């Protein structure tokens, strides 16, 4: 198979690197320790670097074209058992191919940018489509032409280029300089995906999606707000809106049915199950300031979560069902024990208050809370 033939194959295939531990050096093409692919010291494409040997990493066609463009046209390509073997002189590359339906993806893009949506700022489109654009499900779009042309993957960070919003900017008359590339970290992508999963019952509704200078903002039914900028993501949980979700009136609340409350908290718990499964609590400590957790994660490092603040590197805070249940078991002796809510305080935080102020479950809505 020649280069010209390969170009006919790749656009209809989703290509993935089969192993994450790519440490070998093949001729002039180097797969480095951090999974950065270079050719003649020029960085061509970056892949996520995981410890799981069986992890498959997605690569888009634009990146492949850059790599293949450096190879001789007489390079040989062989496909055996879904593995793509490339040889060019002393260079050898082995990849695994996965098929996907290109036409269905094009149809989705057409539906997103259909004139019937009447693009405006903010504008609406289907929630599922929105999450496809902003989560890891975006991978196949990398094989398409404009406006979804190229993406840079580095470790757990997904860099989405401005060209992704070309159609939006054109209709909104936004200059390229006004919007910088967005960074959606693994945590933020998880928050988006888990939010969608938690609210799956409402998937027929649309969400508000707004480009505000350097920020990409999502509004989930005026209950949960997710803002992703070029530096960090913030998730806001307005207590008053959550109370509406709980069908609660007033700030002093009595939950006659604790099981029902746990069910609601579990629905809006955004931490992935993998996080809970790999986190082993060493011990718990209760004091006048509230509940303090000391946890040990799978890597052996100790992680302190004080007063139930869920601190994540990119600034996202979330409910966690397991912690919430511990509070209920510790402080609620019966189903009629009151739970107070404190709306946005001077720091912009909101909280559930248990046991006459003995414990606070804090939900942060400000960047300052991270410092």
What kind of feature is each model-predicted range?
Residues 1-371:
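Structural preference for solvent-exposed beta-strand-turn elements
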